[in-house]
Amino acid sequence: RNTETCQAACKGIEYVSHQAALGSVPRSIKEPVYFNEVNVGGFVNMLKASVDNAVKQFVYASSSSVYGDEPTLPKIEEKVGRCLSPYAATKKTNELFAQVFADVYGLKLLGFRYFNIFGPRQDPDGSYAAVIPLFVKGILKRSPVYINGDGEQTRDFTFVENAVQINIKGMLTSNEQALNKVYNVAVGDRFSVNYLYETCKSQLNSD
């Protein structure tokens, strides 16, 4: 959030990958002002610092949460609904600011809407409510695992290494037609919560 820190971070830098944000939906409901200050204020500071320091390309983390109450499946970038949390609103606002900085200041950007990132060393007790590490923790500790509803609700996912690769490709692309847009980053399929749990049990050789 500190302007001077953002300016110093971008000095002499050609490419920026902005992944920093507060990520808990429940916490955003309790602390909407703080989330706006960090997620939006910090993002705009980094955009301005990138312009001031002639950064070549800027990629950033958006979120599948911007789809809100839009029922269309599969999700397509052009169809978003009403945001359902302050966190989602900050991510949608970031996309709007990115478009403005592209149009007004000529900054080259790409945004990525991640779907449920998972991967090694993910903290099951962290603020990011990720179902896979919660399942793994429960199975390994042989503790109860709770599934809401009938477990047939579906989600899409993003392996963390794929998120890294899309950021690298986004920073380095020279395709002008690809710039100044947002993209879904996911497997491109739907997996039920029950399927995820059974797969985790199978992979961990648990009864």
Regions found by a protein language model. Name each.
Residues 1-15:
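Conserved Rossmann-fold cofactor-binding substructure of NAD(P)-dependent oxidoreductases
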Residues 19-23, 62-63:
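Conserved NAD(P)H cofactor-binding loop of Rossmann-fold oxidoreductase domains
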Residues 24-28:
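Serine-hydrolase catalytic-loop signature spanning alpha/beta hydrolases and amidase-signature enzymes
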Residues 30-48, 52, 56-57, 66-111, ...:
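Catalytic helix-loop patch of NAD(P)-dependent Rossmann-fold dehydrogenases
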Residues 93, 97, 101, 131, ...:
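Hydrophobic alpha-helix immediately C-terminal to the catalytic Tyr-X-X-X-Lys motif of short-chain
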Residues 139-207:
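C-terminal substrate-binding subdomain of Rossmann-fold SDR/epimerase-dehydratase oxidoreductases
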